[in-house]
């Protein structure tokens, strides 16, 4: 078999996009969704593998700016739209695309690569580590009292058209991005994705709605939601399906939840993604009624170990020598001395004795502060070579806020 790995040409994009959908068992996108995907695609960063005239594998990358502990706007390549046709599985095409991408990211000076995974077990062998968790909520509003905080009555709530409120909602989101690791500065045009509302995507729910929360005339929070009607013998038991919820302060956040709790003909609220340190379980009397479930969301891979570790700050002072294994990107292998604190950091090559040993995958998992080095060591994935080196390094990698990816890509 002779195949060619290369960049996608403009005239090939529609076929490339259709092959992506086919690999995921989906129908080709209708025109409106296709236009949104095309606008979000960086064609110059989209690659594929061709067997003759047939596109048999796809992969793309997006030029993100990622918030990391102590810093916002760190360049990160967002790996996306990865597929291999079933006729060409287990022939090394995915490995070739991953290697090609990482070399390209390095050449572009992007110290990090990030992705979300439909099958997480695939990407560990390429150095991607689970770095953030999602908390999914199914809140039993029939048995829970709504949150109450002083000042909530000063918050004005208005139902508005989701598209008309886009600019106000995006300003709220943009103000939150620098504060939490894992959040991405949205690329131009991505706000349109947030309000797509095709009937075949609603899963039985009604139209997408938006409530904005104002204080003194300023929009300080919003929720996008739909109501899924459910009728049982005993009466209505609908579900409020929340797509997005952001707020700039605790009072506005509680006011939005009080609104969602009180929607008529419903008995629960479902929300697919919140950070694991979300306030809602602490705002209600019985957190068991919040139906919390966890799953990994964002995967991180240091492309250049030195640049990546120097791009963030550290919760406590750190001075440690790391022995890094990275057979997929051998330029990262070897010993690195990491020194840093809350004001900045450096990470340089060294010949000093290593104190901790780990792979680049573990560095990715620890990078945003979502998984402690001590926890990774307990799983046998980090080795303490100098007694006493692990605990202070683990504390230094921590984050005041849990990392969170609010949306996929």
Residue ranges: model-predicted function:
Residues 48, 54-63, 78, 83, ...:
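Conserved beta-strand in the GNAT
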Residues 2-14, 69, 149-409:
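Intrinsically disordered, low-complexity, positively biased terminal segments
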Residues 79-103, 249-261:
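Conserved acetyl-CoA-binding loop-helix of GNAT-fold acetyltransferases
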Residues 139-147:
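Aromatic-anchored glycine-rich loop motif in surface-exposed flexible loops
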Residues 5-12, 20, 47-49, 92-94:
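Hydrophobic, small-residue-rich alpha-helical packing segments that form membrane-like cores
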Residues 107-111, 116-137, 255, 276-292:
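Conserved active-site alpha-helix within GNAT-family acetyltransferase domains
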Residues 98, 103-117, 264-275:
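Conserved GNAT acetyl-CoA-binding A-motif
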Residues 23-68, 182-210, 308:
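Active-site rim helix/loop that mediates acceptor-substrate recognition in acyltransferases
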